[in-house]
Amino acid sequence: MRSDMIKKGFDKAPHRSLLKATGLKDEDFDKPFIAICNSFIEIIPGHKHLNEFGKLVKEAVRAAGMVPFEFNTIGVDDGIAMGHIGMRYSLPSREIIADSVETVVNAHWFDGMICIPNCDKITPGMMMAALRINIPTVFVSGGPMAAGKTSKGDVVDLSSVFEGVGAYQSGKISEEELKDIEDHGCPSCGSCSGMFTANSMNCLCEVLGLALPGNGSILAIDPRREELIKQAAEKLKILIERDIKPRDIVTEEAIDDAFALDMAMGGSTNTVLHTLALAQEAGLDYDMNRIDAVSRRVPHLCKVSPASNWHMEDIDRAGGISAILKEMSRKEGVLHLDRITATGQTLRENIAHAEIKDKEVIHSLENPHSEEGGLRILKGNLAKDGAVIKSGATEVKRFEGPCVIFNSQDEALAGIMLGKVKKGDVVIIRYEGPRGGPGMPEMLAPTSAIAGMGLGADVALLTDGRFSGASRGISVGHISPEAAAGGTIALLEQGDIVCIDVEERLLEVRVSDEELDKRKKEWKRPEPKVKTGWLGRYAQMVTSANTGAVLKIPNFD
């Protein structure tokens, strides 16, 4: 066993002595040591219940004849961090999580790992670590939150609350109505109830094969979560016995399938960023062109909030992720069904008995929302290395208009609230990329303000930052190269005409190459917004969004 490094041989007497101080007995040294990587954090609703969750996982691991050791990671609640400097720490926290898990697991030579994530950056951070460490691993997330209901009976979620702010600001609802939405938008523990980033990543974790069937859709408060925990411990023991590791599971084909599900469900645009980072950790050469190819061959079968009023509980009721995959498998060339997963079985075996139970929630191949995926990669002279739009969350497929430029999210939000943005405008929020932000903050507050004011179909928003999975409308993010790297978005001037063509996958500014070259020569890189601490270091090391915004190792040659 891998853990023999710290528990076998006469020279490991000091190590065993320390381990006995934690409560271990001599007989425990013949059992696999299992890292329980938890993320219990009281300020995050999606993680508040994970303390008890972790206890159940440890019981299941002991029952399977193994020895559990629990530790915690950090986490950031993107909703609470939204709209202020806290959002700059969100994406960088992914790297800290990956590094911290790597540190604990490799320092103590565990034989296997069960990861308990749930919310936005915690799930991909742990997945990155699992691929980096490469020991047998199973993921069991904390599960989605249920949707809420206002006193009037309206179904609401977190995106409803954000959009309610814009609606109140523009006089469309009263303060009492906003308070009613606030009080009911997040009714329980769990990851926010729509197809936002957390649920998107937990669904992708399931199809990748790192998590068990049901992981993405079973609610946090559903007793079936406890059954998943028991299964996870049993399956982990099998993975250890068969030496099946994350890099055996997360192949190029598995990532294709993850993006296929993403396209079928119209997941968060953040999935592109995180899954590209996973590919980097797995040592795979996977780029945005391949994502685009998946998007072109996969139909859009589900519209989940914010694209509709359906939520994760509805997906679960309609058959869950397995039912979506089973329907997708009917189309040749969409899925790779014979690859291994954390169940010890193939994807084909995992979904064999699944079926759609509600075809209003999960559409059939014969009745898709669209013939192509709910996420699309755009390119053009404004995004030479690519940009991402959640095409399933807008009915507008082509938009052209003059740009209104803001050099930060705060500046943009103030401008929107002051009425500086009108129907037909293309809002540009720049210098908010991985390096420029730093941290590539999400733009949920500006998009929600625009939607809440009734301009969601009449104003486009482009940024080198990110969008929350709760964002909708004509929102194009991850523009690469970013402004801080001298990308074309940095060269735009007020009133330039910008064209977004979703069907043709184009993102262009109607300015000649000669004029852009002239502007590039005159452009001066702004001073970094942050020069000290973690964000200062992050800004110096982070790479572009089109490569997952991972950190690069400095070249000291």
Swiss-Prot record:
Enzyme Commission number(s) from the entry: 4.2.1.9
InterPro entries, per the entry: Dihydro-acid_dehy_C, DihydroxyA_deHydtase, DiOHA_6PGluconate_deHydtase_CS, ILV_EDD_C, ILV_EDD_N, IlvD/EDD_N
Keywords: 2Fe-2S, Amino-acid biosynthesis, Branched-chain amino acid biosynthesis, Iron, Iron-sulfur, Lyase, Magnesium, Metal-binding
Protein's pathway: Amino-acid biosynthesis; L-isoleucine biosynthesis; L-isoleucine from 2-oxobutanoate: step 3/4; Amino-acid biosynthesis; L-valine biosynthesis; L-valine from pyruvate: step 3/4
Sites of N6-carboxylysine modification: 121
Coiled-coil portions: none
GO molecular function: 2 iron, 2 sulfur cluster binding; dihydroxy-acid dehydratase activity; magnesium ion binding
PANTHER family: D-XYLONATE DEHYDRATASE, D-XYLONATE DEHYDRATASE YAGF-RELATED
Family statement drawn from the similarity comment of this UniProt entry: Belongs to the IlvD/Edd family.
Role this protein plays: Functions in the biosynthesis of branched-chain amino acids. Catalyzes the dehydration of (2R,3R)-2,3-dihydroxy-3-methylpentanoate (2,3-dihydroxy-3-methylvalerate) into 2-oxo-3-methylpentanoate (2-oxo-3-methylvalerate) and of (2R)-2,3-dihydroxy-3-methylbutanoate (2,3-dihydroxyisovalerate) into 2-oxo-3-methylbutanoate (2-oxoisovalerate), the penultimate precursor to L-isoleucine and L-valine, respectively.
UniProt-recorded name of the protein: Dihydroxy-acid dehydratase
Classification lineage: Bacteria, Bacillati, Bacillota, Bacilli, Bacillales
Gene: ilvD
